[in-house]
Amino acid sequence: MPKILQLKGEFSSKRPISNGFGGAKLPSGKTVLLSHIKELLDQLVVIETYWKNVTDIEGALVSVYYRSIIAKSNRVRSLLVQQSGPPEELIRGAKFGWHNNHQFHIFTYYITLENIAKSISILSAVISYFNDQNKDSIAQDDLNHITQNGIPSSYNISKTVMINMVVDCYYVDSLCVEENRVQITENSIISIYNLGIDTKELLSRFDIRIMDNRIISETTLNLYPDELAKLQSRAPYLIAMQLEDFSKINMDELINTDNHANYIEDFSGPNNEPIIGVLDTHFDESVYFSEWVEYENRLSSDIELSRLDYYHGTAVSSIIVDGPRGNPLLDDGCGRFRVKHFGVATSQGFSSFGMLRMIRNIISENPEIKVWNLSLGSVREISPNFISWEAAELDRIQNQYDVLFVIAGTNDSECTHCKRIGAPADSINSIVVNSVDRYKNEASYTRVGPVLSFFYKPDISYFGGDGNNPDGLIAVCKDSLGVSYVSGTSYAAPWISRKLAFLIHIVGLDRNTAKALIIDSAAGWSRSDDISHAKGYGVVPVSITDIISMQNDEIRFILNGHIQDYYTYSYQIPVPIVNNMHPYWARATLVYFPECHQNQGVDYTSTEVDLQFGRVQVSEVDPSVISIIPINNNTQSDEVRQYIYEEEARAQYRKWDNVKHIVETQSSRSRARKAYSGFWGIKVTAKERINGHNSYGMPFSIIITLKAMDGINRIQTFIDSCHAYNWVVNTVDIDQAIQVHEQSEVEIDFDD
């Protein structure tokens, strides 16, 4: 099979010419009832009274219920934001609401009381003006009249503020102060709204005093029941999210244990193999492969461990070290791996708070380990409105330490096929793995996504065993007695950890590219990310060769870059031309690791990177105008902007998702496309939740595959053309990579 290519060259960048939309406008044909504006005014008066009686914080928290999933450009511009600075900086939380199966945004703003008073004054002026105009409803024509003719000075309001307020009122359904009084009798992990006040100082205002070791981040902390009750009594408005601090390991069943004398034949010791980190229950050092595993018990010495506390973790490490021995049909060609195994839990359950503190310390102490396997998870379903604090902490760790977590998708012991995944499988930047049986059908114990009603989780699936027949299960070593047969997502994840470690440590790819290759190979030309959210993008191929190669009629290559500006692009990918046509189907997979902020709720990822890929067209009128004809008709980042509803942008183009996979459907009726310039192009567009340039410098990776409609191999033509246009072309050669790795790890003795 031909080897995948890696193209290296310069990307260009530029800023947008303009936003393309101008001032605030009502959607075409829509109106705002004056009675609705009066309702919002009444609600705001009640809110003002509430906060005049609450003096423990300096400002006011106000929740805005929008009428739908709202784009950044349609958030409030005047209502509640009559103070200096961008309105986005006032947002402290975001979540989804539902009514009659209709989904909408709820944003919580932290504003001044003066801001509320100004908004009340402006709303009153709006109502007075349109009452005087004898208007029961307001249309765009009325706003156009204001733009052209202005507003009498007696109303003490500018026309811009008037128009912005009316448009705000169209998109806003209601206003309120939310209070969290849900009773929990166990220790709780809570998230509070970020008010810019030191956490301990803020809690002391309510006679709550905690040590630093119970503070996870500036807004996430661990409270005892009496402390939570006190906070709910005195400041229920401050709690953004809460849940019990106890996650029970979803232990995967061990069945049909047998002994095999040949299980440990011909097993040599380790050399320079890459190391994978395992965070799990404990490791039995009496097993045959113990020389390959460095084990540390990170629990308190006061915790007495039982025999059961070693089974799960030992089984997971056995797959990573020597999985193909007992599972020859899953021989991936990756060889063996060393393991650094950290015991962070017992078989009976664990405090997720304590475990995550251990994990952060472990990662910081082991910077050489880039792939970490976490086959533990919660029985409890994830919230539709919040990323779990466990997942949020893992996402923070990944950004801070440049590592990649592989997380089991958790199991449903009741086999309902509708139970949502459990924390931390909602980690956005991690690779979350579900199980399939040997026929690639979803396992009976499958749990499903999505996360935050949007993000695809699980990412991919792999063979984790199912049923009662050993032929359909995963062979592992859990103790010194021999082989055991198991099933569960816990035993699918380690196989993916092996592949990622091979790609990163042996092949020498970065984590973006490794993750993109795994997802792209799983999705192929017939992605599985359907409405069931059970298998992710698909089932990853067994052989590592299939992940980093291509078919004879394909051109498959890797592009790596960094976000340089609003637009980062290349218009010079020389796709072969036949009779002035491009006879190819195309697909592309983009992966990047955005910063994530749990206190932003459903607006969790801070950066959107939009992907456009397709033929390049040069304007005949103005040759300086160059555009891409995207293979998926994505026009949301065109320089001549077109309005697309936020729901459509999310559903069709995965806006705000950190993985973009676009693919053309192969059909016998497909025809080659006209070659305009002879080039294809890539353009990525960076958009921020909050104004600024936080994404600048952020790396991304794209895997592109072109499949010849006529079945002809034109790889060499493509390579030659790339060289002509200053692309450096390398092939990803497994054998060469292994040889280079072995030579680089050889110890050299110098003569005295």
Feature locations, PLM:
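Extended low-complexity, serine/threonine- and proline-enriched intrinsically disordered segments
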Residues: 54-90, 186-206, 585-653
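Subtilisin-like serine protease catalytic core
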Residues: 264-297, 302-352, 402, 427-429, ...
